[in-house]
Curated annotation (Swiss-Prot):
It comes from the Bacteria. Pfam families: DUF1507. HAMAP family: UPF0358. Belongs to the UPF0358 family. Gene3D superfamilies: SO2669-like. This is UPF0358 protein Bcer98_2651. NCBIfam families: PRK13666.1. It comes from Bacillus cytotoxicus (strain DSM 22905 / CIP 110041 / 391-98 / NVH 391-98).
Amino acid sequence: MASETVTNHQEKALALLQADAEKILRLIKVQMDHLTMPQCPLYEEVLDTQMFGLSREVDFAVRLDLISEEQGKEMLGELERELSALHEAFTNKK
């Protein structure tokens, strides 16, 4: 029973983190769709805050052994790749 509870908590933690990552990904996609300047202070502030918050959530979940360090790195890495693609798309638009 205890093993089931741990597994349930791990699955729930991963699902919550993925949902938060998806929200950030949607912000990035909206910017890519409109190729709004990524240097906009408001855009940068919101995205930086969201990314920082998610990184803290991931760190907390890793420290509690709810997700693996690799899962956390993969999740954050995917978002960072999307951010790079946004910056590249905007730069190419100029």
